[in-house]
A protein has these predicted regions:
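Helix-adjacent hinge/juxtasegments
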Residues: 61-93
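Active-site neighborhoods of divalent-metal-dependent phosphate/nucleic-acid chemistry enzymes
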Residues: 2-8, 92, 96-144
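Histidine- and aromatic-rich ligand-binding microenvironments
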Residues: 14-16, 47, 126-128, 149, ...
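Short, flexible helix/strand-to-coil boundary loops that buttress conserved ligand/catalytic motifs
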Residues: 24-25, 59, 121, 156-159
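Short, well-structured N-terminal submotif of metal-dependent ribonuclease cores
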Residues: 1-54, 58-74, 140
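Anionic, Ser/Thr-rich low-complexity intrinsically disordered regions
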Residues: 43, 86-101, 108-109, 148, ...
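Phosphate- and divalent-cation-binding pockets in alpha/beta enzyme and binding domains
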Residues: 54-55, 116, 154
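Alpha-helix capping/helix-boundary segments
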Residues: 19, 51, 113, 133, ...
Length: 163
């Protein structure tokens, strides 16, 4: 059974995309409270550069949906250059806000992570992106994860926390 992040007492946690997304979109008061703990230095947070790719894409789609309604992916496919031009400044500002967050360490994805990714996909039947997150977690020695993705529960060494 997963615990909620407000009960997290460890020294470090790895952030999946959902937690920064919830903070930047303002959709979960619990995300703001958790990031306040990080900002105060009560714990260290890690995430991967890969998270920023996922986050930028989700933020872009959310802004398109907010502004135009409908199916944002269909709209983006139909008018990609205009929509990216329109919303990229707002997305970039949000990413910059996150990158400057104190006590948040952004780890690179390295070539050595690919071997861990491949093995994790085989061993735990998880998606490639999530297997790369797992590789980054192993490399920094942080196996506590903030994520709503239940498939991470297939990795016995991880402890998953939710909002």
């Amino acid at each position: 059974m997963n615990q909620t992040l407000d009960r997290f007492t460890g020294a470090a946690v790895y952030l999946d995309t959902m937690l920064p997304y919830a903070l930047l979109r303002g959709v979960e008061p619990a995300a703001k409270a958790f990031f306040e703990r990080i900002e105060q230095g009560a714990l260290t947070a890690y995430t991967s550069a890969l998270t920023f790719d996922e986050l930028a894409y989700r933020l872009l789609l959310a802004l398109i949906r907010d502004h135009y309604g409908g199916a944002p992916l269909d709209l983006l496919r139909a008018d990609e250059v205009r929509l990216i031009t329109e919303f990229a400044p707002a997305v970039a500002a949000q990413l910059q806000r996150l990158r400057c967050f104190p006590y948040l360490t952004i780890v690179d994805v390295t070539p050595a992570d690919l071997e861990v990714m491949e093995q994790a996909m085989v061993d735990y039947a998880i998606r490639p992106r999530d297997a790369l997150h797992y590789a980054a977690m192993q490399r920094v020695g942080c196996l506590d994860l903030a994520s709503h993705d239940a498939h991470f529960d297939r990795i016995p060494r991880l402890r998953r926390f939710i909002l």
